[in-house]
Amino acid sequence: MILLDDIEKKYDFIFPALFKQLWSDGMLDWMNGRTAPFNSDENWAKTIYPEIKDNPPVLLHSGGFDFEMLRAKEMLDFQFDELWNIEEHEFIPFAKTDESNVYAFYKNLKVDKEYAIVYIWNDMNETEIIAKNFEDFIFRKMLEAIFDIDKDDLKGDYKKSGFDGYKIDLLSDLKSIRPYLNEQYVDILTNFYARNAQESMFSYGLISKDELVETIQKHLVFKELDSVFEHEIE
């Protein structure tokens, strides 16, 4: 069994208190404790998901349709691209997308004594600073989860229930993360998630673009927010 201490030693890094608490409570484990490979008649959607969907780990539904938390072994054994300048830029990966873009703590930048969160593009030499700490990262992802929700993405995961099914799952995410977020963030998300959906030709939403931008600017802003830098070897 891989301990968080093992990962901290690997990267010479101390995870923030919130990350440690979520880890301890199983809230970062999308595998529900399973480490063994699946049998031929098993897969994650069939075997694991039904066990965790009603009390979901962090961002299970609200992280985005292509978002996935890394397993402990994936964090420990993460293979950095040979083009990444990891001597200059110290990343501690914790999540990824289907396109192999990576979410990571950025050891080079501390804001109010906590490490910033970055989004590293796999097919471009760009890394974006997206949050000043892990709590803000969760809050931002849960805000973005209710803006411009593509109907084609919904069809893929919610064939019969559509947006209504998606909203039920979002509310489950909010319920499970509620004890870990500050009261202000919980209140904001609760109010937005309680809305009726606005529908356009291609998408649904519970929040407008202006509201999303305004909320981010009001609650998440810091000097380096949304700035971009190159991470590859010159």
Residue ranges and their predicted role:
Residues 1-102, 109-110, 186-234:
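A surface-exposed partner-binding patch
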Residues 2-6, 77, 88, 117-124, ...:
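A near-ubiquitous, low-amplitude feature marking generic local secondary-structure context
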Residues 12, 19-20, 24, 67, ...:
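Generic low-polarity alpha-helical segments
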Residues 28, 36, 40-43, 115, ...:
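Short, surface-exposed, charged/polar-biased interaction segments
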Residues 102-122:
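Short, well-ordered strand-loop elements centered on a beta-strand within folded domains, enriched
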Residues 115-153:
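Compact, glycine/acidic-enriched structural inserts
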Residues 150-201:
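An amphipathic alpha-helical core segment
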